[in-house]
From Swiss-Prot:
InterPro entries: Ribosomal_bL35 (IPR001706), Ribosomal_bL35-like (IPR021137), Ribosomal_bL35_CS (IPR018265), Ribosomal_bL35_sf (IPR037229). Pfam families: Ribosomal_L35p. Transmembrane segments: none annotated. Keywords: Ribonucleoprotein, Ribosomal protein. One of its GO terms (cellular component) is cytosolic large ribosomal subunit. It comes from Buchnera aphidicola subsp. Schizaphis graminum (strain Sg). Residues 1-22 are annotated as: Disordered. It comes from the Bacteria. PANTHER family: 54S RIBOSOMAL PROTEIN BL35M, LARGE RIBOSOMAL SUBUNIT PROTEIN BL35M. This is Large ribosomal subunit protein bL35. PROSITE patterns: RIBOSOMAL_L35.
């Protein structure tokens, strides 16, 4: 069997935590930021965990992580 390739775009977007969960950056913080309040932008800043329904898909993208 050949080795499974890692999806490089996913490798740049997701990081695995010590407990085996995946962290990701939140959306809506790239452009058109002048309309958004400072509070909204501050709440979007921290990384959040990938939802339970998407974990299996992320794991298939990152077989060696």
């Amino acid at each position: 069997m050949p080795k499974i390739k890692t999806l490089r775009s996913a490798a740049k977007r997701f990081k695995k935590t010590a407990s085996g969960k995946f962290k990701r950056k939140q959306a809506n913080l790239r452009h058109i930021l002048t309309k958004k309040t400072t509070t909204k932008k501050r709440h979007l800043r921290p990384k959040i965990l990938v939802s339970k329904g998407d974990i299996s898909k992320v794991k298939s993208f990152l077989p060696y992580f």
